[in-house]
């Protein structure tokens, strides 16, 4: 990935087997791709989906494949537009989120590539955790920094999906809706203990080998990637009280989330800097709060690409104008200069 290029990054479309979202992200995506991407004259073009592109989580392999086919059938225009992009040389990148973690299963990723780029699978890449463009950007969904969604052994999903992994605490709560409150609480407690055990396992040799292989694939310093894997460690003693406070505030119609970059963004950017792997931009999704911000004690700028679904939680233009769809642009000049930022696309061109 070198030379002049333009990167478009967007997230949290939540395309599923139905199409009942009032913002119609599945219908808006092809319009965006044709008006912004396919009309661009940039010599290299990349579109990055920063997680939760699809509703594809908690499924075994066969069900994951079947769901992907159903999503394809429901959102044909979106998939055809993506196929057109790939056919015209646009590189498509899919970073997995907590809602589409099964996308990285080898068979599912291969099927996605076959659907979007029948003539050349190299045009479609799927990432279990993050995408790294040296000196330019790092993009990840962001759920690894949210304790109740965090999956410490995330890289194992690229081998067998979530088959061998315990559910994160919040997923454990949601997986047992028919149980009593006490039964669901017990499931969460067990998931917390499992997360604590998983945090210890990622510090052992077996997981180090997965990290080393991923660092080579990402062209990212191995020690840097190891340290990133250990950021935002799950700790029950801090996760549950914070969650309880958020639940109480949410019930009262309030939120503790502000409009500034999360502390984890600064920690990640400074970790990269410390290893000589600093980047100009750090991009996430997950929170459904679109924003751009400077980071403390670091030259890296942070962008959250918000959501294209109706569940907008930020205070940006998309809160009052549901026809404003957030995305990030990162331009790399022929001289290596990097620029960009958060943008809003409107179907009417406004």
Regions found by a protein language model. Give the residues of each.
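Extended recognition/assembly regions associated with phosphoester-bond processing machinery
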Residues: 1-350
């Amino acid at each position: 990935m070198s030379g002049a290029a333009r990167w478009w990054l967007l997230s949290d479309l939540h395309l599923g087997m139905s199409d009942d979202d009032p913002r119609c992200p599945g219908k808006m995506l092809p319009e965006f791709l044709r008006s912004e991407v396919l009309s661009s004259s940039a010599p290299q073009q990349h579109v990055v989906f920063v997680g939760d592109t699809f509703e594809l989580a908690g499924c075994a392999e066969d069900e994951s494949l079947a769901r992907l086919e159903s999503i394809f059938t429901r959102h044909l225009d979106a998939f055809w537009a993506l196929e057109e992009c790939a056919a015209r040389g646009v590189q498509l990148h899919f970073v997995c989120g907590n809602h589409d973690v099964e996308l990285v299963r080898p068979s599912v990723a291969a099927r996605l590539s076959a659907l979007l780029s029948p003539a050349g699978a190299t045009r479609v890449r799927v990432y279990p955790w993050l995408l790294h463009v040296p000196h330019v950007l790092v993009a990840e969904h962001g759920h690894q920094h949210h304790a109740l969604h965090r999956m410490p052994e995330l890289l194992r999903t690229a081998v067998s999906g979530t088959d061998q992994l315990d559910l994160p605490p919040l997923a454990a709560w949601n997986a047992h809706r028919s149980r009593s409150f006490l039964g669901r609480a017990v499931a969460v407690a067990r998931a917390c203990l499992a997360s604590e055990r998983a945090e210890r396992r990622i510090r052992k040799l077996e997981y180090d080998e997965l990290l080393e292989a991923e660092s080579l694939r990402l062209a990212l310093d191995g020690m840097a990637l190891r340290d990133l894997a250990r950021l935002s460690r799950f700790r029950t003693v801090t996760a549950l009280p914070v969650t309880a406070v958020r639940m109480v505030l949410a019930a009262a119609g309030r939120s503790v989330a502000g409009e500034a970059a999360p502390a984890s963004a600064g920690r990640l950017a400074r970790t990269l800097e410390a290893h000589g792997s600093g980047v100009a931009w750090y991009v996430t999704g997950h929170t459904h709060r679109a924003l751009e911000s400077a980071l403390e004690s670091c030259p890296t700028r942070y962008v959250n690409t918000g959501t294209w679904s109706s569940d907008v939680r930020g205070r940006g233009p998309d809160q009052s104008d549901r026809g404003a769809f957030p995305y990030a642009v990162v331009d790399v000049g022929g001289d290596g200069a990097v620029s960009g930022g958060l943008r809003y696309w409107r179907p009417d061109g406004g």
